[in-house]
Amino acid sequence: MLMFKSKLKIINVILRIMPTNHKGNSGKFPNLASSRKGTYMQALNYPFDENYILSKKKKIKKELLESGRDFTDTRIAILGGSTTNDIKLVMELFLLDYGIKPSFYESEYNRYYQDAVFPNEELESFAPKIIYIHTTNRNITEYPKISDSPETIDELIKSEMLKFTSMWEILEEKYHCPIIQNNFEMPLYRLMGNKEASDIHGKINFINRLNEEFYKYAREHDNFYICDINYISADYGLKKWQEPFYWYMYKYALNVAAIPYLSYNVANIIKSLLGKNKKGFVLDLDNTLWGGIVGDDGVDNLEIGPEESGGQVYSEFQSYIKEHKDLGLVLNVASKNEEENAIAGLNHPDGVLKPDDFIEIRANWEPKDRNFSAIAESLTLLPESLVFVDDNPAERAIVAGNLKGVRAPEIGEAHNYIQTLDRSGFFEITNLSKDDLSRNEMYKENVKRAKLQASFDNYEDYLLSLEMVGTIKRFEPIYTARISQLSNKSNQFNLTTRRYTQTEIEEVMEDEAYIPLYGKLVDKFGDNGVVSIVIGHVVEEVCHIDLWLMSCRVLKRDMEFAMMDELVRLCKEKGVKQIKGYYYPTAKNNMVRDFYALQGFTKVSEDENGSTEWIFDITDDYKNKNNVITLQY
């Protein structure tokens, strides 16, 4: 072990003296991280300098921990088929940057299978919330021989898969948490040349078949996610990724300089699982969605469309942005333009994006940070939920500098826009629900509701005019993924900010000691989907509120009162005499500080951190608080 630690020290010395050797990134951006406002944290923004991150790990971590942000704690077990120490340390930096504070269990070298399959008191007491299995093609037990029959090779595939599936199933049964599993990268050499890909005896063919089996398992099992090192290694450069020196000397299965790219991708999956993804774009127009300035050049002279190379660049970028809309991300515009010019530009006959693709279009001469804030407020989102895309570095600096947590990536030249945004990991998809795919329509319907509200003097009359119909039921299997997603994404209207995996939601659903409720809301403008969650834990004659949250899309629609009414009704059925509520303050949930008081609870305690406890005595003369939502059962 002492010898191993000495080798790690040698690696750190190498990192301090090694030249930058990855032309796609740090070779193109020399000393980039050190130029970003002088903060270590900004070194973590893509495109990053991998060697800078590796050599400044401690300083970056110190700055992140002292940043004053509100962290979500989690426990991550790393089960490695090779050395993982620096993978863990760099992953921690990216997670801290995402507002996630991890603690780690790390297996000994190449003990991933033993730790997973056999009793392990240390891992069991650690009780991971997420498991990452770092295996590579170095961990494939046996490859085909040139003399093997097709049947023998099929058995090799089955044997290799049995090793992994048995491990995954034991981990799932024991820990009930998400599992992140590497697929396999391509080998460094091809014994048969190009025939390796098509011949069943080739290593490339064999690895591709194994990867397909991994993907099939991922499709068929919730809470199982692939870290695509096959793509990441190709993107980085396979020859550089698999630097043999690091394997033979230190048992790192990848070049140490490539570790930030791997750690970054794993961190993006974890960030998505914990509800830290961004939710949409705020986009500039001139020289961002098209080439040229619409107010000066006119619509006919904008660069957009297939007729010339410059126009093709912007058309492809618009298509890329529109594909995000199809995934449920919200698109908005903040542009220094006359509104009629902005709309005319968006109606260009060769444009892919049209005005109807956007929720908010703010085209005026106000500072963009003000327009950005107004857009976020209109969407009932925190500004940090949106990504700002603008070709102008001064505008990016103003927005990112004045709005806490907003990312404004350095997108570079137009032909690099897609690559930069795609590698930035803002929208890593782990689960897609029906509500996700309908989100744009839901926000558009909210715009219609806001216009309707303006025509009423009496707010209750406005609510009644919406013709709202609610469904409040005990958790059902069809909605467990959405319920878990909401528990991890909702931050503002969330009393306790407890986070639940889908497996934990399923366990609560099956346990009669809980009253787990979801609420859906439909009105004359459309279906809002699942928008509210309450989890009550019944202990003797008291129902403890473990979780109460609501999507900000339905704020001030009295859905919380409908949920309270149903909770009280079910408590009565169970013989519950009292409901006990808890409020734990965070940097984002101040809006619900007095929620329990509005529901008729009595505050019984408050600590020095502002956490409060409340009680509500259930009586026979309880009167329903909801007067505007018709409930369906």
Model-derived regions, located:
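Extracellular glycan-modifying ectodomains
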Residues: F4-G24, K28-V282, L289-W290, G295-N301, ...
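Glycine-rich phosphate-binding "P-loop"
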Residues: Q42-K57, L302-S309, H348-P367, A374
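Basic, amphipathic juxtamembrane/active-site segments
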Residues: V294-S319, G405-I411
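Substrate-recognition element of Asp-dependent hydrolases with the DxDx(T/V) motif
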Residues: E316-N347, I361-R362, V399, R482, ...
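Conserved Lys-Pro-Asp/Glu-containing loop-to-beta segment of HAD-superfamily phosphomonoesterases
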Residues: F372-P393, V399
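Terminal substrate-recognition subdomain of acyl/acetyltransferases
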Residues: A400, K404-L466, R569-Y633
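A conserved beta-strand-loop-helix scaffold within acyl/acetyltransferase catalytic domains
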Residues: F475-C543, L547-M550
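Acyl-donor binding region in acyl/amide transferases
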Residues: L521-K524, V530-D607
